[in-house]
C-alpha cells in the first residue's frame, strides 16, 4: 500500500518478525499474489477498461517492460527482468528472520494461476497477452464453461525450449537471491499436482545453484514416492511435505494422481477425501520417517479439530517437524526430545504415542487417562511430570519411577503429556 505500513497494508519486516517471535510462529509460507491489484477480485475474465488500479498491490516477481498493454492495461511484463522491489523485500525478511531462527517456506509457484479459476490466469505474467517474451501460449485463452482454465499441461511442458528456459531462469532466481541465508526451505508450491518430469526438472535446477538451502518435496503421493525411490533425485530432497494425500480414519488411502491437470479441490470432487484421525496422521508421518530417516517430514495435509491439541502432538510424536505445539518453559522437554526416537513397540496409535531413549528419558502423549511404559531395558530412575498439551505448562509433578519393569502411570486428565526426566 503506497505510503502506508501495517497489517494488510505494506508489512514492516521488523514488525512481522517480532510478531512471529511473540506468537511462537516459526514459519512464514510465502508465494506471489494471484494478481497485481484488486480490480480482478470480481473474478471477471475480461481486459480491464482502463489502468485505474486499486490498491493494495501484490507485487509480482517480474518487472514491467514499458511496452504494450497487458490485461490490466498496464505495460506488459518482461520475464527476463526480475522486480527488484519484490526480491529485495523477500531477501530483507530472511536477513532479519535469520537472527531469530525463523524460516521462510518459499513456494516457487502458485498453481492456482494455471488451473481451475480462469480469472487467475487473466493477469498472470506468463500469459502471452501479458508479456513481451513470446512463450507461445495460445491467445485468446479459451475458458471452459466460460470460467475454468486448464493451462497446466502447457505450462509444465519443458520439452519446449522456450518454456524450459524461462522456468530455469525463474527457479534459479528464486534460489540464488538467498545464497547467503540459512532460514529458507524451497518448495515447488503448496498446490502442486503436476507431473513427475517437471518435479525432477525443478529439483535439478535448484540443486544446480550453489548454497541452495533446504529443499522440500511437495507433491501428490505417486510423484513423491517416485522421486524418493530415485537415487539421483532423492539426494536432492531434505524435507518430505505430506500435503496432497492422507490416510483416512478407516485406514484407506486418499491419493490424487499427479500430472492429470486437476487442482486438489477438483480431485476432491471426483474422489471422496474422507476424514482423518490423529492415528491416521501419526501413521503417515511415522511411515515416511521410518522409510527416509535422513529427511525431515512435515505434515500439512487434511486435519480435523480435536481437543487438547492432539493432532499436532501426533505429528510431533511420530517424528514430524514444524508441528504446532506450545513452548514448554518450565522443563527442557524439547531439548531432551531432540535425542529421542519414536518407540513403535510402546505406541498404540489409538491410545498412546511414546518416544524416548534408554538412559536419557521418555515422552508420551496419553490419549486416555493412563500411559503404559515398558522400562525393562532401562535401570535409571526418572522424575515424572504431566504437561498440558495446549498450554505447555506443568500440571503435576508425580514423584519418580525406576526402570527395570513395566509401569502404568495415571494421568491427571485425559490427553496429557507425560515426561520422564533424569
What is each model feature region?
Residues 180, 242, 340-343:
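A structural signal for alpha-helix termini and helix-coil/disorder junctions
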Residues 196-303:
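Glycoside hydrolase catalytic-domain groove-lining segments
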Residues 179, 191, 245, 320, ...:
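Residue-level marker of positions within ordered structural domains that often coincide
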Residues 265-399, 406-422:
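Aromatic- and carboxylate-lined catalytic core of secreted/periplasmic carbohydrate-active enzymes
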Residues 68-71, 149-154, 179-181, 203, ...:
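Generic detector of short, locally flexible boundary/turn motifs and exposed helical patches
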Amino acid at each position: 500500500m503506497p505510503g502506508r505500513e501495517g497489517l494488510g497494508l505494506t508489512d514492516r519486516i521488523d514488525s512481522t518478525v517480532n510478531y512471529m517471535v511473540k506468537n511462537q510462529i516459526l514459519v512464514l509460507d510465502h508465494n506471489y499474489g494471484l494478481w497485481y491489484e484488486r480490480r480482478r477480485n470480481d473474478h471477471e475474465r475480461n481486459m480491464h477498461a482502463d489502468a485505474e488500479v486499486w490498491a493494495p498491490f501484490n507485487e509480482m516477481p517480474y518487472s514491467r517492460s514499458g511496452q504494450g498493454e497487458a490485461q490490466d492495461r498496464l505495460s506488459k511484463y518482461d520475464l527476463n527482468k526480475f522486480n527488484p522491489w519484490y526480491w529485495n523485500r523477500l531477501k530483507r525478511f530472511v536477513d532479519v528472520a535469520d537472527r531469530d531462527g525463523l524460516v521462510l517456506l518459499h513456494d516457487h509457484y502458485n498453481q492456482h494461476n494455471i488451473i481451475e479459476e480462469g480469472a487467475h490466469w487473466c493477469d498472470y505474467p506468463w500469459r502471452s497477452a501479458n508479456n513481451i517474451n513470446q512463450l507461445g501460449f495460445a491467445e485468446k485463452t479459451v475458458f471452459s464453461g466460460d470460467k475454468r482454465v486448464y493451462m497446466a499441461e502447457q505450462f509444465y511442458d519443458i520439452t519446449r525450449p522456450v518454456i524450459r528456459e524461462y522456468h530455469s531462469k525463474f527457479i534459479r532466481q528464486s534460489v540464488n537471491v538467498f545464497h547467503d541465508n540459512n532460514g529458507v526451505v524451497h518448495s515447488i508450491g503448496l498446490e502442486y499436482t503436476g507431473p513427475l518430469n517437471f518435479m525432477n526438472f525443478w529439483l535439478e535446477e535448484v540443486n544446480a545453484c550453489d548454497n541452495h538451502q533446504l529443499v522440500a518435496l511437495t507433491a501428490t503421493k505417486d510423484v513423491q514416492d517416485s522421486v524418493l525411490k530415485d537415487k539421483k533425485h532423492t539426494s536432492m530432497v531434505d524435507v518430505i511435505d505430506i500435503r496432497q494425500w492422507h490416510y483416512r480414519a478407516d485406514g484407506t488411502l486418499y491419493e490424487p494422481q499427479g500430472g492429470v491437470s486437476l487442482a486438489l479441490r477438483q480431485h476432491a470432487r471426483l474422489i471422496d477425501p474422507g476424514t482423518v484421525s490423529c492415528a491416521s496422521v501419526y501413521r503417515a508421518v511415522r511411515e515416511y520417517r521410518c522409510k527416509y530417516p535422513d529427511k525431515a517430514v512435515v505434515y500439512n495435509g487434511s486435519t480435523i479439530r480435536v481437543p487438547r491439541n492432539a493432532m499436532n502432538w501426533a505429528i510431533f510424536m511420530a517424528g514430524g517437524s514444524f508441528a504446532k505445539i506450545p513452548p514448554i518453559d518450565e522443563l527442557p522437554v524439547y531439548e531432551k526430545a531432540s535425542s529421542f526416537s519414536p518407540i513403535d513397540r510402546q505406541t498404540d496409535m489409538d491410545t498412546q504415542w511414546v518416544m524416548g531413549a534408554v538412559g536419557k528419558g521418555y515422552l508420551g502423549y496419553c490419549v486416555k487417562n493412563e500411559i503404559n511404559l515398558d522400562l525393562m531395558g532401562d535401570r535409571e530412575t526418572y522424575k515424572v511430570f504431566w504437561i498440558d498439551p495446549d498450554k505447555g505448562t506443568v500440571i503435576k509433578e508425580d514423584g519418580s519411577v525406576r526402570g527395570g519393569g513395566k509401569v502404568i502411570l495415571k494421568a491427571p486428565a485425559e490427553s496429557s503429556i507425560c515426561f520422564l526426566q533424569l
